[in-house]
Amino acid sequence: EKVREYLDVLDRQSSRLKKLIQDLLEASKASTGSINVELEELDAAVMLSQVAGEYKEKFEKNNLDLIIKNDVTPVMIQADGRHLWRVFDNLMNNINKYAQPGTRVYIDIIPKDSGAIITFKNVSATPLNISSDELKERFVRGDSSRNTEGSGLGLSIAESLMKLMNGTMELTVDGDLFKVTLEF
């Protein structure tokens, strides 16, 4: 029985370590620009909907109500599909881990002439006594109590990938309101 517990702990910890190493490699490659980027015309609304579908059960488990506002479809942008998926996934994962349970999560998709502005907004479960710039640094986490798993690389990776796709990522913290704006 004890041996089984130890093996389970070892398995979980080795999986965490593997994920950390993968994130470190991706963060390094993304920040130095040594990642292959293949820009193509994509429907951001469709991809966001697919990523949101992957988080549906997790959000329900945390009693998070996802509201996606998109008045126009399709919303065509120039992006690399793999990297855009990772950006959306990182942001949704952050929301799932750090949002106040029982609150609403808003995602607004606003088409513009040659791209789109996509805004993610949620209320943090804990006060964010940290600047927006600090949150985007590697290994920095808004949850200083370390109650959740994570490497503190997600936002840094997302920002680097956005730059590689000729986009921008702006992060705003206002009290416990967390807002990320992606612009393509």
What kind of region is each of these model predictions?
Residues 12-17:
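Short alpha-helical segment of the dimerization/phosphotransfer core of two-component systems
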Residues 127-140:
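Short conserved segment of the HATPase_c
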Residues 38-56:
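A conserved beta-strand-to-alpha-helix junction within the catalytic ATP-binding
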Residues 95-96:
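Short helix-loop "hinge" at the ATP-lid/N-box region of the Bergerat-fold HATPase_c
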Residues 32-37, 76-79:
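Conserved micro-motifs of the catalytic ATP-binding
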Residues 38-42, 60, 65-75:
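Conserved catalytic submotifs in the C-terminal HATPase_c
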